[in-house]
Amino acid sequence: MKFLDEAKVYIRSGDGGNGCVAFRREKYIEFGGPSGGNGGRGGDVIIEVADGLNTLIDYRYQQHFKAQKGTNGMGKDRHGANGKDIVLKVPVGTQILDEDRETLIHDFTKLGERFVLAEGGNGGFGNAHFKSSTNRAPRNANPGQEGEERWIWLRLKLIADAGLVGLPNAGKSTLLSVVSAAKPKIADYPFTTLHPQLGVVDVDGREFVLADIPGLIEGAHEGAGLGDRFLGHVERCQVLLHLVDATCEHAGKAYKTVRNELMAYAGELTDKVEIVALNKIDAVEADELKKQKDRLKRAAKKTPLLISGVAGTGVKEALRALVEVIGEAPVSEKAKGAAQAEPWAPQNV
C-alpha cells in the first residue's frame, strides 16, 4: 500500500429540508387548520479513527464528500426524514487543519475517536408550527438551513514512542530491521527510505514503537533532498535516537547538520530527549573510531553510545536507554477540539 500522509478534501454537510405549507382537507371537517410538517435535518460530516489504517491514500482518489440532505416536510403533519451522515475514516495520529494548513481543528490520538466536523442544517418549520390563537391559518413555513461547506487538510503524524534521526545511510533502517519485525528497504545509497517506517521493539519484556524517517541533509528545511516534511512523524515521540555514521568524514559535522535541520523545522524537536549513538563501529579501525567518538562527543556535548546495527554490538544498551526515557516521560499529547457554535433553529416569522 502506498504511503500518503497529507490530503486536501472538500466536505459539505447536508441541507435541512424545507417546511411545508398544507391544510387539512378531510370531509366534514370545516376549518381543518394547518397540517404542514417540518423538514428533516441534514446529515453531518464525521471524521472517525479506524483500526487497520496507516495512510491517507484513499483521499488521493476521492476528495469530495457530501452528506445527505434532509427531505422536505409534507401535509398531514408528516415530517421529512433526516439525511444520512457521512463518515470519513482516518488512521490514528491524523490531524484536521483548516484550508490555511496552519489552524489546527482537531487532533486524533485514540482509536475509535469521532469528531463532527460539519453539522447538518436543521429542517425548516412547517406551517403547523406557527398556528396560534391569533393566527389560525398560517400560510408561511421556513426553508431548511443550509449545510456547512469547507476545504480542509488531513495530515497524518505517526504515533511512536521513539524516533530515529540522522543523515542518509546512517544505518537507521538497518537498526529498525534488526530490533523489530519491520522490513524496510535497505541499500548502500542515499535516500533508500522514502517513507516513514514503524516497528514494535521488545526489550526485557517491555514494548515500544520505533519510527524510522527518511534521512536529512543540509538544507532539508529549504527542500533539499526529500525535505523535512517527514519530521512531523517524530513530533509525537518522547525520545530521539540520533544515529551518526562512524564511516563518514567527520562525525561532529554530521551531527550538527541534523541538529540544525531539526532546529529549522521546529524548535520543539531540539527540546526532546536525545540519545546519540555512533553507528557502524565495526566498519572502522580502532584509531579512527576513537577520533570519531571524540568529535561526536564535542559536538553533542555528551558521550555517545557505540553500536553496530549489523553486528548487534551495543544495540541492547541503546534500546534500554530508550525504554528508560519512555517510561519516565508523561503523555503530553491531548486531543484538541474546535469550539462548537450554538445550534441554529428556524426563526418564527
From Swiss-Prot:
Residues engaged in binding GTP: 166-173, 191-195, 212-215, 279-282, 308-310
Domain Obg intervals: 1-159
Coiled coil: none
Localization annotation: Cytoplasm
Enzyme Commission number(s) of this protein: 3.6.5.-
Family, per entry: Belongs to the TRAFAC class OBG-HflX-like GTPase superfamily. OBG GTPase family.
Listed name of the protein: GTPase Obg
The species this protein was found in: Rhodopseudomonas palustris (strain BisB18)
